């Protein structure tokens, strides 16, 4: 299974909509930047028909160094999670 990169998306959209690669790159970069800025400011991002990017606070916990087995403290942190929407889940499920 191949991985789709940002460059692949830019090239696909540029070809499909007959836009310059630079214009398409600007649109994709600005779209992703808006998502980043929203998450940085503490807002969840909901993309209808696709899914939600949500912020979750994880508490500190004890962890283990896999090489040495020593117990180490894993500090509290905020993480971004992605929860696919129903439409996306249904379409992915159909491809099995």
UniProtKB/Swiss-Prot annotation:
> Which InterPro entries is this protein grouped with?
Hist_DNA-bd (IPR000119), Histone-like_DNA-bd_CS (IPR020816), IHF-like_DNA-bd_dom_sf (IPR010992), IHF_alpha (IPR005684)
Keyword line:
DNA recombination, DNA-binding, Transcription, Transcription regulation, Translation regulation
Q: Which GO terms describe its cellular component?
A: cytosol
GO terms (BP aspect): DNA recombination; positive regulation of metabolic process; regulation of DNA-templated transcription; regulation of translation
Q: Which molecular function term from Gene Ontology is one that the record holds?
A: DNA binding
Q: Which family does it belong to?
A: Belongs to the bacterial histone-like protein family.
Q: Which NCBIfam families match?
A: himA (TIGR00987), PRK00285.1 (NF001401)
Q: How does it assemble?
A: Heterodimer of an alpha and a beta chain.
According to its UniProt entry, what is the function of this protein?
A: This protein is one of the two subunits of integration host factor, a specific DNA-binding protein that functions in genetic recombination as well as in transcriptional and translational control.
- Return the protein name: Integration host factor subunit alpha
What organism is this sequence from?
Haemophilus influenzae (strain PittEE)
